[in-house]
A protein has these predicted regions:
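Eukaryotic helix-grip
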Residues: 1-146
Length: 146
């Protein structure tokens, strides 16, 4: 997992780092997300678990927030609850079907107009940037440890 690469494609992510590796298919990481005024930046600590079916090669990334893992950063709102899943399925040579679901409590007061904007814009911008990042950084030859 290229967690530090999140800043290149994950929408509004300004900091990403691995806090702990727990084998080849599990880790804990930290991300900070830039938020527009008047909202303070948000951060998350995430426990990531990866599963892959050896026959179908379908890979699932299960992410769960663990907000108390490290102390909160001053001036940044810690996300108290987050869950997400990436379902990645090979469908043809060099083609993937990716389904992403996320449930999040952003913490604090976030105007509805801003949540609506980010909910619509974030996934689109992230997937667009992810595709470009994969193509430009040539991840097709990457060796996955699972």
């Amino acid at each position: 997992m290229d967690i530090t690469g999140y800043t290149k494609w994950q929408y509004k992510t300004i900091n990403a780092s691995i806090l702990k590796s727990i084998g080849h298919q599990e880790l804990i990481y930290y991300v900070e997300i830039l938020s527009p005024w008047p909202v303070s930046n948000r951060d998350l600590v995430v426990h990531l678990r990866i599963e892959q079916n050896s026959i179908t090669e379908i890979t699932q990334f299960h992410c769960r927030g663990i907000p108390d893992y490290i102390p909160a950063k001053e001036g940044v709102s810690r996300v108290p609850m987050s869950r997400s899943t990436w379902h990645v399925e090979p469908i043809a040579n060099n083609k993937l079907k990716i389904e992403y679901t996320m449930e999040i409590d952003p913490s604090g007061s976030v105007p509805a107009w801003l949540m609506n904007k980010l909910s619509a814009e974030g996934p689109y911008e992230s997937f667009f940037a992810l595709k470009n990042s994969i193509l430009s950084r040539n991840y097709s030859k990457a060796d996955a440890p699972f």
